[in-house]
C-alpha cells in the first residue's frame, strides 16, 4: 500500500482524526467498512446543519441520541469502527479488492478504475448492453452474480439514483 509521505509514520486512527478535523460534515454507513450489521451516522461541526438534520432524523430514524439503533447495535458499530482502523485489516481488504480486480481483468470484465478499498464497480452496461436501461441492467447483473456465484453485490445507478425528476427517464 502506498500513501502520502507526510502520513508515513502515523497510525490509521491519527490519519482519520486529521481528515475529520478538516471537514464540515460527513455521513457514514456502518455497514460498509464500519464492520457493523446496521447503522450509520451524520456528523457536522455546524449547529445550523445539525438542527436541520435532527428534525429529519427524528421523523425517520428516532431520537438524535440513538437514531433508532439499540444499545447493542451502537456498541457493535463502535467496536467495528475501531477494528476497521487496524492496518492489517485494511491491508487485507485492499488485497481482496485487488485480487478481484485482477481476476476480472483476466476475464475481460470491464470495471471503473481506479477501484476502491471496499468496492469495485463493474460496468454493467458494457456487459449487458442488449438489455434496455429501463429493465435495470445493473440489478440484473447483481442478481445473476448472486445466483451464479453466491456473491452479494449492489446496483449503483439506475435504480438507486432514481429517475430524473423532470423527464422521468433513467
Swiss-Prot record:
Its cofactor is pyridoxal 5'-phosphate. InterPro entries: ArAA_b-elim_lyase/Thr_aldolase, PyrdxlP-dep_Trfase, PyrdxlP-dep_Trfase_small. Pfam families: Beta_elim_lyase. The lineage of its organism: Eukaryota, Amoebozoa, Evosea, Eumycetozoa, Dictyostelia. One of its GO terms (biological process) is amino acid metabolic process. Belongs to the beta-eliminating lyase family. This is Putative beta-eliminating lyase-like protein. It comes from Dictyostelium discoideum (Social amoeba). Keywords: Pyridoxal phosphate. The modification N6-(pyridoxal phosphate)lysine is found at residue 32. PANTHER family: BETA-ELIMINATING LYASE-LIKE PROTEIN-RELATED, TRYPTOPHANASE. One of its GO terms (molecular function) is lyase activity.
Amino acid at each position: 500500500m502506498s500513501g502520502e509521505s507526510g502520513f508515513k509514520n502515523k497510525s490509521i486512527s491519527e490519519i482519520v482524526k486529521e481528515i475529520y478535523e478538516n471537514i464540515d460534515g460527513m455521513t457514514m454507513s456502518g455497514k460498509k467498512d464500519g464492520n457493523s450489521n446496521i447503522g450509520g451516522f451524520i456528523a457536522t461541526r455546524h449547529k445550523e446543519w445539525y438542527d436541520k438534520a435532527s428534525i429529519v432524523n427524528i421523523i425517520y430514524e428516532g431520537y438524535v441520541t440513538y437514531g433508532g439503533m439499540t444499545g447493542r447495535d451502537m456498541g457493535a458499530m463502535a467496536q467495528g469502527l475501531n477494528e476497521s482502523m487496524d492496518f492489517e485489516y485494511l491491508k487485507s481488504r485492499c488485497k481482496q479488492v485487488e485480487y478481484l480486480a485482477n481476476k476480472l481483468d483476466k476475464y475481460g470484465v470491464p470495471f471503473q478504475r481506479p477501484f476502491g478499498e471496499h468496492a469495485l464497480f463493474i460496468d454493467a452496461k458494457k456487459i449487458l448492453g442488449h438489455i434496455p436501461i429501463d429493465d435495470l441492467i445493473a440489478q440484473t447483473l447483481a442478481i445473476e452474480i448472486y445466483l451464479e456465484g453466491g456473491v452479494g453485490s449492489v446496483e449503483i445507478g439506475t435504480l438507486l439514483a432514481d429517475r430524473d425528476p423532470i423527464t422521468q427517464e433513467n
